[in-house]
From Swiss-Prot:
Official protein name in the record: GTPase Obg
Cofactor(s) annotated in UniProt: Mg(2+)
Highest rank taxon of the organism: Bacteria
Disordered: region residues: 120-143
Single GO molecular function: GTP binding
Localization terms from the record: Cytoplasm
Pfam families linked: GTP1_OBG, MMR_HSR1
Residue ranges with Polar residues bias: 129-138
Length: 336
């Protein structure tokens, strides 16, 4: 399936139905008076998160969503039927903006979350509402009100606990395939990963966390070079970042520093997230290789996904940091 993480769609709620002009006509009621019913309200447009969706692909092929209008009012004070609401399913993690002003309308991050995005117009009043002491037979009614309409700019930001960041061919895809059930494309050339991959990492019996692998970034990514920039948004919601550098790198700490600099240039709070330096591909490290000293305040773990070296230690540390972030995010109990 093609991965699409941005889309623009037009939504329009239904117009309200027209109020009715009608008069009561019965054999023994010569002056029955007005009995025109009100028009029905137009249908609303809702957005709802669907945990089975992982992309905005559907919106590439369908660009307009129109809710039905309300039915017109009828005689005998019968109101028109309300227009049927329509519900548009989107993936969890969808950020919705007004495409014209780019104002954020909703950030949908919970399962089965719903929000009304466009309200249907009210139905017009029938002539029964306009009778007065001086006008007992009004021939006036109201048209229905217009339903709301707007263009939406939707952006998908994947929901994950751990984000994997590294240069192309740093071993991210192999790592996520070993730690989780994810099966990304893996090959020994740069830019194998062209779309983000999510993997669920099982930890002990009933614990797990979600890991996101994005395409490799290169120096200058924050200015638009390479593939990584357009996918950095997918690690904005992560709790921690694992920065991967291959053991065959000429200068591991310099490469790590470049990755950190790109995260800082991109902004959006990425540089404030807890980080872990992971030295990968220890199975191909030079014979005289020495694991460098970790940068201040940053943990360092050396692993080989192929040989399984260091993988348990890595999983333990990732779980520890994810759990710590979750505890820090919990609201304090009363009295604390």
């Amino acid at each position: 399936m093609k991965f699409v993480d941005s889309a623009t769609v037009f939504v329009q709620a239904g117009d309200g139905g027209r109020g009715c002009v009608s008069f009561r006509r019965e054999k023994y009621v010569p002056k029955g008076g007005p009995d025109g019913g009100d028009g029905g309200d137009g249908g609303n447009v809702w957005l709802r998160t669907n945990s089975h969706l992982t992309t905005l692909l559907d919106f590439k092929y369908r660009k307009k969503y129109l809710a039905p209008r309300g039915a017109h009012g009828m005689g005998s004070r019968k109101a028109g039927r309300k227009g049927k609401d329509i519900v548009i399913d989107v993936p969890i993690g969808t950020l919705v903006r007004n495409a014209e002003s780019m104002e954020v309308i909703a950030d949908l991050t919970r399962p089965d979350e719903e929000i009304m995005i466009a309200r249907g117009g009210h139905g017009g009043r029938g002539n029964q509402h306009f009778a007065t002491s001086t006008n007992q037979a009004p021939r006036r009614s109201e048209p229905g009100w217009k339903g709301e309409e707007l263009e939406l700019a939707m952006e998908l930001k994947l929901m994950a606990d751990v984000g994997l960041v590294g240069f192309p061919n740093a071993g991210k895809s192999t790592l996520i395939s070993v730690l989780s059930a994810a099966r990304p494309k893996i090959a020994d050339y740069p830019f194998t990963t062209l779309v983000p991959n999510l993997g669920i990492v099982r930890y002990e019996e009933y614990k797990s966390f979600v890991m996101a692998d994005i395409p490799g970034i290169i120096e200058g990514a924050a200015e638009g070079r390479g593939l990584g920039l357009q996918f950095l948004r997918h690690i904005e919601r992560t709790k921690i970042l694992a920065l991967l550098v291959s053991a065959d790198s000429p200068d591991i700490l310099a490469e790590y520093g470049t990755l950190v600099a790109e995260l800082e240039k991109f902004g959006h709070g990425l540089i404030q997230k807890p980080r872990l330096l992971v030295v990968t591909k220890m199975d191909i490290a030079p014979g005289d290789f020495v694991v460098p000293e970790a940068p201040e305040g940053v943990g360092l773990i050396a692993v080989s996904s192929v040989a399984g070296k260091g993988m348990k230690e890595l999983k333990d540390e990732l779980w520890r940091q994810v759990s710590l972030c979750e505890r820090q995010a919990e609201p304090p109990e009363d009295g604390e």
